[in-house]
Structures are given as C-alpha cells and as structure tokens.
Amino acid sequence: MSSVLNPSSPHSWDLCCSSSSNRSYHRPTHPIVGLLVGQLSVVLLIGAFIKFFIFGEAPPSPSRSQTHRTSQHKRSYSIHGARDLSPRTLKEKPSSNVLRPVPSSSTNTRSILRKTYYSANPTNFPSKHGRHRPHHSTHQPESLDWFNVLIAQTIAQYRQTAYILKDSPTASILESLATTLNNPEKKPSFIDEITVTDISLGEEFPIFSNCRVIAIDDPNSDGGRLQALMDVDLSDDNLSLAIETNLVLNYPKPYSAILPVALSVSVVRFSGTLCISFVPGTTESSTNLTPTSSNIDTNLRSNELRGKTAPQESSTTDEGSQGGATSTTGIPKTSLAFSFLPDYRLDLSVRSLIGSRSRLQDVPKVAQLVEARVHAWFEERVVEPRVQVVALPGIWPRMGRTGVRGQEEQPDVSSSDAAGVSGAKVSMLGSRDTGAEMLHAAREVDAEGLRYRRNPPPGDKGSSSKYAQQNQSSRERGRADDPFRIPGSLPDAVPIT
C-alpha cells in the first residue's frame, strides 16, 4: 500500500512510464484516420458529381407557352419513326447511304396537316371550264396582318429602287417599259413609236385577308398537294401609266396621214382570290414548266432585232426564259406557283385624247377597247387555269451573301448602275468592313510583287530595274489604298548635339 501511494517507489515509476507510453502510442492514430476519411469523402463527392451531373440525363425542358391549344394536341409517332429509336453506330452503313431516305408518308398531304394541327375537309372537284373548284377547309380563316406589313415593306423598297434608278440608261423602269411597248414583233405597223409620258407606282399597299389552306388532287404528287387561298384588295391608289403615240396611215404611201393619240390607264380597284402552291423540284415538272425551244428562239430573234443598244437586257431575258424551274446548273428547283381565281374584279379608268387640232377627249369606245385588252392580258397570264411559276432561290447561308448592317448613313447614289451597287454595298458592309477589304487588296498587291523578287541573272540590269520598278509601283499603290495610313510625312529627325 505504501509502495503504491509513494511516488518515489520503483514500482510506481514503472506503472507511470507504462501508462504514458501507451498514451503516446495511441495518440498518432487519430490524425491518420481523419485524413483517410477526408480523402474518401472527397473521392465520393467527385464520383457523385461526375455520375449525376455530367453523365446524368438532362431533364425535359419546359415549353415556352402552356396554351390550351398545345395541351390539346399530342404527337403520335408513326411506325416509321419507331425504327429510329434504336441506337446507331457511326459505321453502321457505308458513306454512300448517309442521307436517310424520306418516307412517302412524310410528304403526304394528310401527314402534313396532321403534324401542323390543321383541319381540312377532303375536297370534291367539280370541274368547270377545265378548272377544279375545291371546297374550303373547316379551319378558321386566319388574318394576315404580319404578311401585309412584309409585303408593304417589299413594295416600298421596289418603289424606292425604281425612283433611284430613274435616270439609269439600262436598269430604269422607263427604259424597260419603252422597250416592251416598242417590240417590233408585237407592235403593228400602223402604230408609231410609243413614248411613256407618266408612270405612277402608287402609294397604297394591297391588303391580304381570310387565308385558308385546302388540299387538292395532283397526279404528279402522292396524296395531292396543298394550296393557300387568300383574299387581296387594292383600292384608292394612283397606280397609272400614260403614253403617247401616233396612228400612221401607210396607204397609198408610208406616213400618208398621222393621228396623235394620248392614253392614260389607272387602276381604280383590284380585288380577287390569290392561290399559292409549291411545285416540287422534279425532273418532269421542270421539263413541263420550262419554255419551249421555239419560244426561246423567238426571244433571241427579238433581241437581235433590237440591236446592241440593250445587251444587258437581252442577257437578262435569255436567263429568265431559260431559267424557269431549273437552275443554271441543270438541277431542278422547288418553284412557287401563284394565280387568281376567275371571280376577280379589276376596275380601270381610261382617259384618251385623239387628234391634234380638233381633239376628241375620253372616247367611250377607246376606253372599252383598252379595258378589254388589259383584261385579256391579265387573264392570259395569272388567271386560272394559267399560273405563274417562279423558281425559289437557295436559302443556304453563303459567304457571298453575307453582310453587316452599316453604321453610317447611306451615301448619295449616282445615276450609273455601278455607283448604285457600290453605294448599297458600302452602306451594307459599313466603313470598317470596307477598310478591311481595301487593306486586304493592298496586301494582295504586295504579295503579287513578291513573285518578282527573285534574283535576276547576273549581268541583266534591265530585268533588275524592271523588278525594282514593279515593286516600287506596287508599294505605292498599296500605300495609296491603305485606309489606315496616317496622312502627311513624319517630322525630320532632330540631331543630337
């Protein structure tokens, strides 16, 4: 008992040493265990993040608008779409079969109407005058306010362009009308040269409304094709054309008598139903829609008779006559066909002035003849069953059609076509892109001069001087075209004394 209580005894010293040694042996184990637990928790967190955030499936994105209309329609997948759900490998098929075939049901009229949630009645086609008269669809007619704004902007741009190019010798609307009216193959011999005295492109815009889509039968397409019908109305506009000419009596000798005639035709009101449909770009349709060889030969002969005064117009006519629904490379394009139903309304106001001394004004018979001729011209071109077919341009993005909206105002456009095109290009690209193009051209000039910087043969001083002159001239042109060059010369160096 005394040995235990006495700290100076040897047995008590041994017990104290053994207990202290045990505490010092177990004390370092706690930091190691904590370090291992911390590392393990970090690894687990990283693994959970990779699994659930990186390789996890993305949640379905909510729709932008939960309207009553979208909640009613449920997409039904066809049997053709079930095969696409199976996983595909990158090298499952050869490279020649990369483009998947389009099933015939995807271009069917019923499939298009079902996928776009548009209801249309199956149409019956009682024919009248060789024209099919379809029933209207059960879908409610739609307003075309946005379309009216788009068409109004397009017409306004055409009017502005026609006014800017009014003094152009080749691209003006006045020159085009004069050339068309004085066509020697269509103008009779008793009519002298026709002069256009006044043109008014109007100030109002057509209003489209009551748009509906119908399905009609078409033997060239599977399941028929779709056609859009819309009402168009244009009234209270000053769309007019005034001309002057002479009626020539060529008997018993040429120009035996001359009767001056002045006519003015104005559109008071136009209303009708516009039909729009798309013609697929197949080889058969492009063959049927392109003009015949006889028409092309007739156009070529008429261009030869005009002479060399309008070469640009003749080339444009040839391209337009040969283009049709087929591109210049021979690949058929999808075309837009539009026409008007026969129940259209075209009210004209015709004013006439005949004679030089004793003049007859507003002759009713002349007005009747002019109105009949205008109606016949309109019906021969855009009234059912005749349609106008326009090849749609390619909408694939290309660098040649890429532009940047200019930050500066559009400069004044001169009368020449080149100045008008260049001014429009400068305003579209902006000053920054124009400067970049000029700098690029200057660099090309310098690069062109590098080709001639080879060492000339020994003893040939003429070639070396020629190369030096070429390099010097190219550098001067490059400096002159450089828009970032600081004008003026640098100050002279100050000598250090």
Swiss-Prot record:
GO terms for molecular function: lipid binding. It is found in: Endoplasmic reticulum membrane. Residues 66-77 have a biased composition (Basic residues). This is Maintenance of mitochondrial morphology protein 1. Residues 140-393 form the SMP-LTD domain. The SMP-LTD domain is a barrel-like domain that can bind various types of glycerophospholipids in its interior and mediate their transfer between two adjacent bilayers. Residues 1-28 are lumenal. It comes from the Eukaryota. Component of the ERMES/MDM complex, which serves as a molecular tether to connect the endoplasmic reticulum (ER) and mitochondria. Components of this complex are involved in the control of mitochondrial shape and protein biogenesis, and function in nonvesicular lipid trafficking between the ER and mitochondria. The MDM12-MMM1 subcomplex functions in the major beta-barrel assembly pathway that is responsible for biogenesis of all outer membrane beta-barrel proteins, and acts in a late step after the SAM complex. It comes from Uncinocarpus reesii (strain UAMH 1704). It is a single-pass type I membrane protein. Its main location: endoplasmic reticulum. One of its GO terms (cellular component) is endoplasmic reticulum membrane. It holds the Pfam family MMM1. Homodimer. Component of the ER-mitochondria encounter structure (ERMES) or MDM complex, composed of MMM1, MDM10, MDM12 and MDM34. A MMM1 homodimer associates with one molecule of MDM12 on each side in a pairwise head-to-tail manner, and the SMP-LTD domains of MMM1 and MDM12 generate a continuous hydrophobic tunnel for phospholipid trafficking. One of its GO terms (biological process) is phospholipid transport. Residues 56-497 are cytoplasmic. Keywords: Endoplasmic reticulum, Lipid transport, Lipid-binding, Membrane, Transmembrane, Transmembrane helix, Transport. The gene is MMM1. Residues 60-107, 284-330, 402-421, 437-497 are annotated as: Disordered. Belongs to the MMM1 family. InterPro entries: Mmm1, MMM1_dom, SMP_LBD. Residues 95-107, 284-302, 311-330, 462-473 have a biased composition (Polar residues).
